[in-house]
Amino acid sequence: MDGRKGSTVNLEDRIALHNRMARAYGDAYLRQGVQDGEKFVDVWKFHPDCMYASPYFTGDEAFKLSEFPEESARASTMEAKVYSLRFPDWKPVDFKHWPADNGFVMKTRWQGTNKDTGTVMGFYSYSFIDTDDNGEVVRWETHINSEYSDFLDVAIGVHGPFHGTHEYTDALDRRLAEEGLTV
């Protein structure tokens, strides 16, 4: 099943794979296992030229995933661990996904209770994942709603929009260092 060798996955199997990929993502976060290193991306196979884009996280540019300083699983663990410092119960409270022949879309309502104030805060994220005929991710795009900036101000002390491949993960690293933690 290697896109560089010309094999393809039939349509029914590709849609089933997209369903599994979305569920792996939602389930890993729902169990709050990502903050402890659980990898939803084990089900995801990335094309070597996979692109990531997000107006909030990377500005107006798309970047190869290989250009990011952290691989996706580690970056996801960093993010979940940092968020859980202030919001120990942070996780999806609503997760929907729609598989298709060329990828899938996910809509997630993330929410948590601020351990210091008892205030519940949350935001929506929307991810669009495009795959090739082999089920390898070729583009991953993330959008979030306006509540996210307020959430980040509390969770990591800074909010975006961020630019480039490292501003956001650098902010996560700083927050972990403040707590004497590493990933």
Task: Please report, for each region that a protein language model flagged, where it lies by residue.
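C-terminal and inter-domain tail/linker signature
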Residues: 2-183
